[in-house]
Amino acid sequence: MSTVITILNGPNLNFLGKREPEVYGTETLEYIEKSCQDYAKKLEFMVQCHQTNCEGQLVEWIQEAIGMSAGLIINPAAYGHTSIAIFDALKMFSGPIVEVHLSNIHRREAFRHHSYVSASADAVIVGCGHEGYLFALEYIAKQLRYGYKKRSNQTLLT
């Protein structure tokens, strides 16, 4: 069986391609998921993709990924700026974690500049559009192949 990488997408990402294409691009979530599946296959991994508009469901999927997935990619969308529950759940995951945002959150409204998720992620990719997911897959694949070591859960949240 192939090694699994879980990809989680948060609220409103089911409307990609329709919602603010000047910010998020014209690619649909289905296109992004298919691109990730195809690229993961080339990297000899398998991906499981999920999307929800509900914070609690994201937490449950993170918990399910513990012990089942080798790596995790999360685009928490707006929950990145507000969810301590997602931050806490991610801290329990022992594999590499990459936070992805399609847009550059640091060039947008001030309330989007901070992400709780970033404090529990090994890497953060912003502003690269749908290709950010592919970069995240590449990063996780390299980490897993070359001896990933979990970083300290100590954070600098203030």
Curated annotation (Swiss-Prot):
This is 3-dehydroquinate dehydratase. It holds the Pfam family DHquinase_II. It comes from the Bacteria. One of its GO terms (biological process) is quinate catabolic process. Homododecamer. GO terms for molecular function: 3-dehydroquinate dehydratase activity. Its EC number is 4.2.1.10. The active site is at 24 (proton acceptor), 101 (proton donor). Keywords: Amino-acid biosynthesis, Aromatic amino acid biosynthesis, Lyase. Pathway: Metabolic intermediate biosynthesis; chorismate biosynthesis; chorismate from D-erythrose 4-phosphate and phosphoenolpyruvate: step 3/7. InterPro entries: DHquinase_II, DHquinase_II_CS, DHquinase_II_sf. The record marks 19 as: Transition state stabilizer. It catalyses: 3-dehydroquinate = 3-dehydroshikimate + H2O. It comes from Bartonella bacilliformis (strain ATCC 35685 / KC583 / Herrer 020/F12,63). Substrate binds at residues 75, 81, 88, 102-103, 112. Catalyzes a trans-dehydration via an enolate intermediate. Belongs to the type-II 3-dehydroquinase family.
